[in-house]
Amino acid sequence: MLRAHNLHIRRGRKTVLADVSLQLEPGEVLGVLGPNGAGKSTLLGALCGELSAHEGDVLLDGEALSRWSGTQRAQRLAVLPQVSTLDFAFRVEEVVGMGRLPYQSGRVRDDEIVAAALRAADAGHLSGRSYLALSGGERQRVHLARVLAQLWPGQAGQTLLLDEPTSMLDPLHQHTTLQAVREFADRGAAVLVILHDLNLAARYCDRILLLEGGRPVALDTPQQVLRPESLKAVFGLEVLVQTHPERGHPLIIAR
């Protein structure tokens, strides 16, 4: 379980994240929303240990992140950054196989997991191709498969952090990606995902953290967070919020 308490992060004299406390629960997808510059990626950097908090702490299973060895942490915590750079002509399955480096589970088992993770990311048909020959959206799905393989099949005690995993994807693959994330959480893992699409967050997230100016505005269910007054205050956007006629989650329509 990953928990953050009273996080504050500064860059120079500017506070870029303040007063953030949260706990990622097993089986939960927590969405993070906010305008550009709200502190979403900074929060993810602090949660994975890439950025050090000036105040507050981040605990993984009750222990400070710094107390875990790299291998121990990698078996419990996987991170998909906003941009994943790779300039070598690895085959797709080799890229996904990098997620298995923290383990010694054997080639046969690793190959099975890589194939399963590629299928989960709707990227199985890309196997055998050069990573460099892929489109931006295809690369994004391959990297999703990599972090899924790192924690496969997903269980309580494991945490997946995703920074805008749908940013390069067409509408179909936005949904297949978040369906894969949802299924991963349903097997017991905790997931935090940064999104910009309000309706995707409403459909796939159990709770939503709304950030503005580096500070939390709300942390609650989609029904409680995605209200017209909150979205107007944070995004400057006039919206109608209705109930989805089939699924029951909020449906946000720009006026």
Swiss-Prot record:
Annotated ranges, domain ABC transporter: 2-238
Stored CDD domains: ABC_Iron-Siderophores_B12_Hemin (cd03214)
Q: Where in the cell is it found?
A: Cell inner membrane
Keywords of this entry: ATP-binding, Cell inner membrane, Cell membrane, Membrane, Nucleotide-binding, Translocase, Transport
The way this protein sits in the membrane is described as: Peripheral membrane protein
Q: Which Pfam families match?
A: ABC_tran (PF00005)
Give the EC number.
7.6.2.-
Assign the protein's first listed, main location to one coarse class: membrane
Described by its record, this protein's role is as follows: Part of the ABC transporter complex HmuTUV involved in hemin import. Responsible for energy coupling to the transport system.
- Name this protein carries in UniProt: Hemin import ATP-binding protein HmuV
- Annotated source species: Pseudomonas fluorescens (strain Pf0-1)
Top-down, what is the taxonomic lineage of the species of origin? Answer: Bacteria, Pseudomonadati, Pseudomonadota, Gammaproteobacteria, Pseudomonadales
